[in-house]
């Protein structure tokens, strides 16, 4: 050190401050992969100018398992469980798209009872998804009670999954040609009892969040999506409906027997995080109505009957296998070799909870798909994070990821 404290022999930058030539460098930080608000294994490199996000660079692929390639070496039936492992928050909705694609190519008509059961469990999946999304988004912005309440309700729905097919999460319940097995009458009764009580739970969650000052401040006017951006980025689902466009595949291109059900399509006005939260809450109420209608239809005389389109795609009844040699051979061939699908290509899409989940299937006439392209909504949503997060504060990034509703099973595949 020099003797005179007033004259530095080293450059401490104080001269630059006087001349105004100090260069301020932007700050790069890693958001994730172990960040609690990253919803899985998202790694994002954020470039910050103070608190403001200048650039958001998502690094995906940490959960990549090569699903689409693996599917090319499995039979059509063996591929169904892969779909449970994509969006593992609401598994049955993904299986639905795969089964619809196979049924389109083979021209299989699904029995009415199976169709109603599919609708019932698709809507249960929608509630499973939205409950998790709404409550974890509340947790991301600082509320701790909603996730506890939300998980309590999800647990009840998981038990319905388990009672229908034996598995809580990876169900493998939807099959090409119908569903794996029929629902017992007391399960239908219990689902109906639950659906009648559920709106009260939604009221409780809304009481905590909807008019909560902090929740509003953290979500209102954050990540506003315009109509032009929707077309540019390929948004679907709540990301579209939150901006005031009533686009819902259950209405626009009805599949299964959705055209028989009475429900409204919830839309927002402002296209921000808060509106998307409100849309998800409204959708859960509409799904509850659909569940109650489905329970009534399953009890009606025209809702009775078989739950599988008996033929080459589906196994024979257990009783037939005990008496008929042909049935036993058919069962053995189906589960070893699998069924063949006529050559062709088809795109089947369903309104999954996160958006339009589609399967583009190319068949070559064998028992395995030639190529299956999975169109996951979360992938299309996450690609736009740089565009929508730019200019927001660092604290808003977790709200934006929460409102996009990303799950890495389906993004990385």
UniProtKB/Swiss-Prot annotation:
For molecular function, the Gene Ontology terms on record are:
NAD binding; NADH:ubiquinone reductase (non-electrogenic) activity; quinone binding
For this protein, the Enzyme Commission number is 7.1.1.-
Main localization is membrane
Keywords of the record, alphabetical order, are:
Cell inner membrane, Cell membrane, Membrane, NAD, Quinone, Translocase, Transport, Ubiquinone
Membrane topology category:
Peripheral membrane protein
**Which top EC class is named for this enzyme in its record?**
translocase
Disulfide bridge map? none
Reaction(s) catalyzed by this protein?
a quinone + NADH + 5 H(+)(in) = a quinol + NAD(+) + 4 H(+)(out)
Q: Which Pfam families match?
A: Complex1_49kDa
Provide the Gene Ontology terms for cellular component: plasma membrane
Q: Where, subcellularly, is it found?
A: Cell inner membrane
The record's HAMAP family line, in alphabetical order, gives: NDH1_NuoD (MF_01358)
> What protein family is recorded?
Belongs to the complex I 49 kDa subunit family.
Q: What does this protein do?
A: NDH-1 shuttles electrons from NADH, via FMN and iron-sulfur (Fe-S) centers, to quinones in the respiratory chain. The immediate electron acceptor for the enzyme in this species is believed to be ubiquinone. Couples the redox reaction to proton translocation (for every two electrons transferred, four hydrogen ions are translocated across the cytoplasmic membrane), and thus conserves the redox energy in a proton gradient.
**Assembly behavior:** NDH-1 is composed of 14 different subunits. Subunits NuoB, C, D, E, F, and G constitute the peripheral sector of the complex.
Supply the name of the protein.
NADH-quinone oxidoreductase subunit D
UniProt source species: Rhodobacter capsulatus
Lineage at the top is: Bacteria, Pseudomonadati, Pseudomonadota, Alphaproteobacteria, Rhodobacterales
Query: What's the encoding gene here?
Result: nuoD
């Amino acid at each position: 050190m020099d003797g005179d404290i007033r004259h530095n022999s080293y450059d401490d930058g104080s001269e630059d401050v006087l001349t105004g030539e100090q260069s301020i460098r932007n700050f790069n930080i890693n958001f994730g992969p172990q960040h609690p608000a990253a919803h899985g294994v998202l790694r994002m490199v954020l470039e910050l100018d103070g608190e403001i996000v200048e650039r958001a660079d998502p690094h995906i692929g940490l959960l990549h398992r090569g699903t689409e390639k693996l599917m090319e070496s499995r039979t059509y039936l063996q591929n169904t469980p892969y779909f449970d492992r994509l969006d593992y928050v609401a598994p049955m909705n993904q299986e639905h798209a795969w089964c619809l694609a196979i049924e389109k190519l083979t021209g299989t008509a699904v029995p009415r009872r199976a169709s109603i059961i599919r609708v019932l469990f698709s809507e249960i999946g929608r509630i499973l998804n939205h409950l998790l999304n709404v409550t974890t988004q509340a947790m991301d912005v600082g509320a701790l009670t909603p996730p506890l309440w939300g998980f309590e309700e999800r647990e009840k729905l998981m038990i319905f999954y388990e009672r229908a097919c034996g598995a809580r999460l990876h169900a493998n319940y939807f099959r090409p040609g119908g569903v794996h097995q029929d629902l017992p009458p007391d399960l239908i009764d219990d689902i109906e009892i639950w659906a009648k009580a559920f709106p009260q739970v939604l009221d409780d969650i809304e009481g905590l969040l909807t008019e909560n000052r902090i929740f509003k401040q953290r979500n209102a006017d954050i990540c506003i999506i315009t109509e032009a951006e929707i077309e540019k980025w390929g948004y679907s689902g709540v990301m579209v409906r939150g901006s005031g466009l009533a686009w819902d595949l259950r209405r626009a291109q009805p599949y299964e027997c959705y055209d028989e059900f009475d429900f409204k399509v919830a839309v927002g006005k402002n296209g921000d995080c808060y509106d998307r939260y409100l849309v998800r809450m409204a959708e859960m109420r509409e799904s509850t109505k659909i569940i109650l209608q489905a329970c009534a239809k399953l009890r009606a005389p025209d809702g009775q009957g078989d739950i599988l389109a008996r033929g080459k795609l589906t196994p024979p009844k257990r009783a037939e296998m005990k008496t008929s040699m042909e049935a036993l051979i058919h069962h053995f061939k189906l589960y070893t070799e699998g069924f063949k699908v006529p050559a062709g290509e088809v795109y089947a899409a369903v309104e999954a909870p996160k958006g339009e989940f589609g399967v583009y299937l190319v068949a070559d006439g064998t028992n395995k798909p030639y190529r299956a392209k999975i169109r996951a909504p979360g992938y299309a949503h996450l690609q736009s994070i740089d565009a929508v997060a730019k200019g927001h504060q660092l604290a808003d990034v977790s709200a934006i990821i929460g409102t996009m509703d990303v799950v890495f099973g389906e993004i990385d595949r």
